[in-house]
Amino acid sequence: MLIGFAAAPAAAANAGVELPYDRGDMTFIDDGDVFKVCDTKADGHGVTGTLRGINHLTGKIVNLKSWDDGGDSGCDGGNYDVRGNSAHDMVLCWHGGGPCKVSRVFKENE
């Protein structure tokens, strides 16, 4: 499956993406460069959230970091230093199948 970047209007640096049917969500909090991935439905399937960016040498989209959540209480995640004017997005996938959801493109300096 090919998922690409799409232009987005300028907005606050915090960003998020949600799966349908309340299956899960992924959030970026600019203050501290914190990413949080939450499996929000007790359906036996977890979720994976992936941070992506552009490789400026090749122009290709690359996966920078992934976090999984499911089967435990609370959310998972961690820190990743999102820098300057580089475009990023997040992809959230449910382990039960179906299409992944992609966040808006965001930059730290928005």
Regions found by a protein language model. Name each.
Residues M1-A12:
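Secretory targeting and sorting signals
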Residues A11-E110:
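Post-signal peptide N-terminal regions of Sec-secreted extracellular proteins
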